[in-house]
Every structure is written in C-alpha cells, then in structure tokens.
A protein has these predicted regions:
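Pepsin/retropepsin-fold aspartyl endopeptidases
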Residues: 1-338
Length: 338
C-alpha cells in the first residue's frame, strides 16, 4: 500500500514458472560507478549497479523533503521502461495500459485484487473510474526483463491497473538477482549469478563495522519481507515496503500503545482502489528489531477488512531517513541513524 494508488501485494503465480538469468555485455547509460565501501565490496563480489531515481509520483508539487518512490530504468521485451522498486510487492507487475507498448498478452484470471482497506467506491472521481474498475488481475510472461547488465528471461508477471509508471519490480525478481537496495544513496546492486550466503556474510561484517544494525527479515507465506517491531513496547511485525511512502501501523496497535492520534485529510490508497483515511501520531520508541527510532511520526490506519490480516508497513520515508540497505537475497536489512 502507498499514498498513491499501488499495485497488488497478493498476486500468486506458480513457482514453477522460473526465470533464467544471464549477463549482457553492453554497459547501459544508467550503470554508474560507486566509490563507497558498499559499492567496492559488491563489485569485488561480481555485482553490477544501477542508479535509482527518486520521484514524487502523482504529486509533482510535493515539498522537496517529502518521501519519494524509487524508480529504476529497465527494459521490458527490449523496450525502455520505468519501474517502481517495491519490496512490498512479491510479483513483478506490468501496468495494464502498457501491454501494447511491451507486446505483452494478458491472460485473464478470476482472482480479485485484494486489500485490507475498506472499499473506495466514493473515491472514484479522485483517481479515475478506469483505475478503480480494474478489480481483477491478470498474468503474463515477459520474454525478457533487463536492468543494467542483468537480463532475466521468461519472467512471470501480474497485470494490474498501475498509474504513473510502466510497472513494479517485485521482491521475488530482486531475490533472483541477489539484489541489494541502498535506499539513502539510491542504487540497486545485482548479481546475475543470484544470491550467495558468503557475500551476505561479508556484507554483514562490513556494514556492522560501519555502525549499521542488522535487522533479520522473514519471508512470509505470501512472499513479503517481514521484520519484528514494537511501538512503545507493544510488539508487532512490519512489512519492509519501499513502495509505500508512509510507515503505517494498524490503529488498534496505536491505541494499545497509548499513542495520541490526530485525524488528517490524507487518504491511504491500496490495491484494487481500496482506501482509508489515516491518523498520525508521535511514537516515543519505535523499535525495528534491535534498532530504535525515537520520536517517530507514524501513520495509523483502521484496517476494516477482517478477511486479510493487518499488514503494517515500513515505508520508504523511514527507510531513507535511517540509511536502510536491504539485502533481499540474504534476508537482512541494515539500519543506521542518519
């Protein structure tokens, strides 16, 4: 979920539809040298790097210090594409209105795009009927998806109504290429050979020596990246979601933690056109595993749909302000106070 309409997080495609990965020779224009210790280590381990852009999707007039989405320049079926880097979405998504551009044929399904947010039929005028009418997702297979020098072939994707970008790069494909995402100095590092435990151990040692705190991630049953957290001592879990601008917690946790929540005019938009108004509150102690953030401004949302378990989200704003480095392949996140 995000504060702009976001693609579904609940697409489930068969794991048998595996992708093959190869390394292309030409150096793309967006592959840039990185002189940091992180870049040096990963280059020694055979990684490539693609810089990421930070963009205000749907709100070009937003203040400069507002959180921004991470965008990667990629190629879909040899056609240039802009994809949102979204660790909160397992399956890579392609926007339904870009199918002709990429020569992709959608296979319709009877599976609804679902969201824990309440129905947003009254928001139809705000975002446009065409977006909210698309409540079913389709599936397709890309011939190729290229990022930097890394080419993934035969890529299963979901098809959904996605505004502003050509699609969403999901965490499953990031895992396939052993991706390491630097949120504060936006870059995506990739290993065409895939994730390796020895590289993750070297990365852990280097980052901890530089003052980072390791936060173990767990892969949930629906392939989301989850970490332990607590709100003023109240334990919970949160999804690491670079596709969400805000860090959002279920309202009942805020009540239990004694948070004073203020109403806002901001609407959180979820998949399938669902929406909910958010409240904000100042949390004295927001702990992400062993990493503690003091006086954090958190958004609280009332998740009314009991068919889906509450999904608290650790959004890109909090990730950037705490210098997050996400080792998707190694299932670890590293945080350091900015």
């Amino acid at each position: 979920m995000a504060q702009v309409p976001a693609p579904t997080q609940t697409t489930n495609l068969s794991p048998a539809l595996a992708a093959t990965i190869s390394e292309a020779k030409p150096t793309p224009k967006d592959a840039v040298p990185n002189n940091s210790e992180l870049g040096s280590l990963l280059r020694q381990e055979g990684f490539g790097v693609v810089k990421l852009k930070q963009e205000n999707l749907g709100n070009r007039k937003a203040p400069k210090n507002n959180p921004k989405h991470l965008i990667i320049d990629a190629e879909v079926n040899r056609v240039s594409a802009s994809l949102m880097v979204d660790t909160g979405t397992p399956i890579t998504n392609i926007a339904r209105d870009r199918l002709e551009k990429f020569g992709v044929v959608e296979q319709k399904t009877s599976h609804r795009v679902t969201s824990p947010l309440e129905s947003a039929s009254n928001k139809r005028r705000r975002w446009g009927a065409s977006f909210l009418a698309a409540t079913f997702y389709g599936i397709a297979k890309l011939n190729m998806l290229a990022m930097g020098n890394c080419v993934i072939q035969d890529v299963p994707v979901a098809i959904d109504a996605i505004p502003y970008v050509d699609g969403v790069l999901g965490s499953d494909d990031m895992h396939r290429i052993g991706a390491v995402v630097d949120c504060a100095k936006p870059a995506l590092y990739y290993a065409p050979r895939g994730p390796r435990s020895d590289t993750s151990r070297k990365l852990e040692t280097m980052l901890q020596n530089n003052g980072f705190t390791q936060v173990p991630m767990r892969l949930t049953s629906n392939h989301c990246l989850e970490v332990a957290c607590s709100i003023n001592g109240v334990p919970s879990t949160v999804i690491v979601d670079t596709g969400s601008l805000a860090t959002c917690v279920e309202k009942s946790i805020g009540i239990k933690a004694g948070i004073i929540m203020k109403h806002t005019r901001t609407v959180l938009m979820g998949s399938g056109g669902a929406s909910a108004r958010i409240r904000t509150g100042r949390v004295k102690q927001f702990a992400i595993s062993d990493f503690e953030i003091r006086d954090a401004n958190i958004s609280f949302v009332d998740l009314k749909n009991v068919d889906h378990p509450p999904a608290n989200l650790l959004g890109i704003g909090e990730l950037v302000s705490n210098s997050a480095i996400i080792d998707v392949g190694g299932l670890s996140m590293y945080l350091r106070h900015y």
